[in-house]
């Protein structure tokens, strides 16, 4: 039976590349036992983004700095996927408002029960 496992290796150069330095610093801050798991997850997440648009992981990688915020990442995703992000945002707003309506209805019922009892 053939072993189908694959070893993936590449070098990071933190002295030359700022993104590589951020990656190395982050990996150094993680317990050694968790690093392989994070490396695998990061590769898988990058490939998931690549499958949506091959530019995505490269843009995120190139624009990563110590100051990169979640909002910066969302803005990059908005520029690459304007329709999908707009659809995503509208579904969140719809969910949020219907959840608020449900909470309001529940609160009204509770208040009514207090008046009855």
Swiss-Prot record:
InterPro entries: Plasmid_stability_protein_StbB, StbB_sf
Keyword Transmembrane helix applies: no
Gene Ontology biological process terms, A to Z: plasmid partitioning
Annotated region described as Disordered, given as residue ranges: 92-117
Keywords from the UniProt entry: Plasmid, Plasmid partition
Source organism, top-level taxon: Bacteria
Pfam families: Plasmid_stab_B
Role according to the record: This protein is thought to be involved in the control of plasmid partition.
Full protein name: Protein StbB
Gene: stbB
């Amino acid at each position: 039976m053939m072993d189908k496992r694959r070893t993936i290796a590449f070098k990071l150069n933190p002295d030359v590349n700022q993104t590589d330095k951020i990656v190395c610093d982050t990996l150094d801050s993680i317990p050694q036992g968790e690093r392989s798991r994070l490396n695998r997850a990061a590769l898988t997440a990058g490939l998931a983004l690549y499958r949506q648009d091959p530019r995505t992981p490269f843009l995120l990688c190139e624009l990563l700095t110590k100051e990169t915020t979640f909002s910066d990442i969302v803005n990059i995703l908005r520029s690459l996927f304007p329709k999908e992000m707009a659809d995503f945002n509208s579904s969140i707003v719809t969910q949020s408002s219907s959840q608020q309506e449900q909470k309001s209805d529940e609160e009204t019922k509770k208040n009514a029960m207090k008046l009855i009892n």
